[in-house]
Swiss-Prot record:
EC number, as in UniProt: 2.5.1.43
Highest taxon in the source lineage: Eukaryota
Pfam families reported for this sequence: NAS
Descriptive protein name: Probable nicotianamine synthase 2
Keywords: S-adenosyl-L-methionine, Transferase
Gene Ontology terms describing biological process: nicotianamine biosynthetic process
Lineage of producing organism: Eukaryota, Viridiplantae, Streptophyta, Embryophyta, Tracheophyta
């Protein structure tokens, strides 16, 4: 079995390496038939369950993976900017969001994130104010949450790119409900401090802090400034999907001053994992907290995991004791 797994991993890495080389040679990552075809092939290769642990690959494969994630980030940004401009041409852009090819995926992802928050954050969840870090030119997640799940919540969307925020704000100009509850800010999360304490929930986009050490710094910064009891929603990846998005170690979240409440690794045709955490009350001023144990370390097997498949899946609150929770019906994840 181990030999078979090794052969499968080797074949996958070889395929991904070839796709990386082809994508890197493209003259542009703006939407086009060639770009769309290569990224479709890439996602198709990465989504199926795989024994690969991308964090344990050799240096050459790691370098390839890091470069590929940067290319994916650039291509995703260009795709979203393209559709944001297209949607902005309508008098009522929000009536035409279905033009974006992955809009339904955002609906499913946001539904899952909301239901995980409602299930695992003590006391249920009706946040008054939410921050989304890394919202981009198409803030679908904020829109879906505001329109479908959080009708009274105010949303502050943060992005490094002023042009992305300008594009995003145009989409909401004609909407008196959701548009009135959306604001957009151009800022680096590292420059946010006191304002973070006013949020009941902070969402951290998958591509904010692409290197593991950068992601850990962002999480520690959030832990230093978020209010005690506030929730953090982190998008991650698992298995071969780690070639597309950064993988977040739950222990880094613990070391950042949070208690991890739930982790979901979908195993269908989706990409992002979801981690739900809550600010610990014993967080230190430098953003490093104790988490569940000394230094934020988790005992092996005690990180609470939502077992795949998330669709009609079982909630596992304590892997060590194999304690099964109620079925989590009709929840799907996508990127």
């Amino acid at each position: 079995m181990a030999a078979q797994n090794n052969q499968e991993v080797d074949a996958l890495v070889e395929k991904i390496t070839g796709l990386h080389a082809a994508i890197a040679k493209l003259p542009s990552l703006s939407p086009s038939p060639d770009v769309d075809a290569l990224f479709t092939e890439l996602v198709t290769a990465c989504v199926p369950p795989s024994p690969v642990d991308v964090t344990k690959l050799g240096p050459e494969a790691q370098e390839m993976r890091e470069g590929l994630i940067r290319l994916c980030s650039e291509a995703e940004g260009k795709l979203e900017a393209h559709y944001s401009d297209m949607l902005a041409a309508f008098d009522k852009p929000l009536d035409h969001l279905g033009m974006f090819p992955y809009y339904n995926n955002y609906i499913n992802l946001s539904k899952l994130e909301y239901e995980l928050l409602a299930r695992y954050v003590p006391g249920g969840y009706r946040p008054a104010r939410v921050a989304f870090i890394g919202s981009g030119p198409l803030p679908f997640s904020s829109f879906v949450l505001a329109a479908r799940h959080l009708p009274d919540t105010m949303f502050d969307n943060y992005d490094l790119c002023g042009a992305a925020n300008d594009r995003a704000s145009k989409l909401f100009r004609a909407d008196r409900d959701v548009g009135a509850r959306m604001s957009f800010h151009t800022a680096d999360v590292a420059d946010l401090a006191g304002e973070l304490a006013k949020y009941d929930v902070v969402f951290l986009a998958a591509l904010v802090g692409m290197a593991a050490e950068d992601k850990a710094k962002v999480i520690a910064h959030l832990g230093a400034h978020m209010a005690d009891g506030a929730a953090l929603v982190v998008r991650s990846a698992h298995g071969a999907r780690g070639f597309l998005y950064p993988i977040v170690d739950p222990q880094d979240i613990g070391r950042g001053g949070f208690e991890v409440l739930a982790v979901c690794h979908p195993d269908d045709d989706v990409v992002n994992s979801v981690i739900i955490a809550q600010k610990s009350k014993d967080v230190h001023a430098d953003g490093l907290g104790s988490g569940r144990g000394a230094g934020g370390q988790y005992a092996r097997g005690t990180v609470p995991v939502v077992s795949p498949p998330c669709r009609f899946g079982e909630m596992v609150a304590d892997v060590t004791q194999n304690h099964k929770r109620d079925e989590f019906a009709n929840a799907e994840v996508a990127f």
